[in-house]
């Protein structure tokens, strides 16, 4: 049975490149902070199995009733053991979003589907996509069904799941560094709607999706640095599958909360389409 706790995290939490444990949430008054975070007891399972998009489409999860906020499924946050996960959660809580957090080895994708999520957020984390538990399988099986947002390693999971290669950045480690990022969403509403172009982001990574092997038949680049590194991408067919290489929850990313808000808007738009 899942244990439930309420949290309050610090937006200014520094990030360690070697972090392998997430922040311990402190209990707060549920009357002042109604956001609920569900945390399952740890049980490690080997659940990764590469699945096809066609299989995901033929085994869709139940539809979400959207006429009452209490009837929404949660946005599921897959925590890849990163110290910034709860800063992302803090943004979602401040935006009035109901969500649940599970570590990447605490449940299977089938168990995740049964929670009827309205969206999925794959958090940053140490290591490579192969260290991300159910994240890769989640991209392939739930991505076609509900909006999916990958952050940092979450974007790398999207890239690898659809055939890209994850390599060390040719420009070295970026740890707490700011960069100017340019974007082009081709006039469509997306993660960067309403942002300055370019805008400033905070970066904490040493790996990137390799430009030469970028799976352009499946994905399209939506944002990049001035030196040409991929900073965001989305699926060509399932445009609600998208991710960013930088950290929107970092204080360096001055317009980061707008990006999280835009993800929630994408979730709401997807729900409204189910009613038409």
UniProtKB/Swiss-Prot annotation:
Tagged with keyword Chloroplast: yes
Span of chain positions assigned to the transit peptide in the UniProt entry: 1-50
EC top class named in words: lyase
Record-listed E.C. numbers: 4.1.3.27
Disulfide bridge positions per record: none
Gene behind this protein: ASB1
Effect upon mutating residue 176 to E: In wei7-2; insensitive to inhibition of root elongation by ethylene
Pfam families attached to this UniProt entry: GATase
Domain Glutamine amidotransferase type-1: 74-273
A GO CC term assigned to this protein in UniProt: chloroplast
Effect of residue 150 to D: In trp4-1; no visible phenotype under normal growth conditions
Pathway: Amino-acid biosynthesis; L-tryptophan biosynthesis; L-tryptophan from chorismate: step 1/5
Active site: 152, 247, 249
GO process terms (BP): L-tryptophan biosynthetic process; regulation of auxin biosynthetic process
Induction line: By ethylene and the bacterial pathogen P.syringae.
Name of this protein: Anthranilate synthase beta subunit 1, chloroplastic
Role summary: Part of a heterotetrameric complex that catalyzes the two-step biosynthesis of anthranilate, an intermediate in the biosynthesis of L-tryptophan. In the first step, the glutamine-binding beta subunit of anthranilate synthase (AS) provides the glutamine amidotransferase activity which generates ammonia as a substrate that, along with chorismate, is used in the second step, catalyzed by the large alpha subunit of AS to produce anthranilate. Plays an important regulatory role in auxin production via the tryptophan-dependent biosynthetic pathway.
Subunit structure: Heterotetramer consisting of two non-identical subunits: a beta subunit and a large alpha subunit.
Tissue expression remark: Expressed in the central cylinder of mature primary root zones, including pericycle and early lateral root primordia, and vasculature of cotyledons.
Keywords for the protein's UniProt record, in alphabetical order: Amino-acid biosynthesis, Aromatic amino acid biosynthesis, Chloroplast, Glutamine amidotransferase, Lyase, Plastid, Transit peptide, Tryptophan biosynthesis
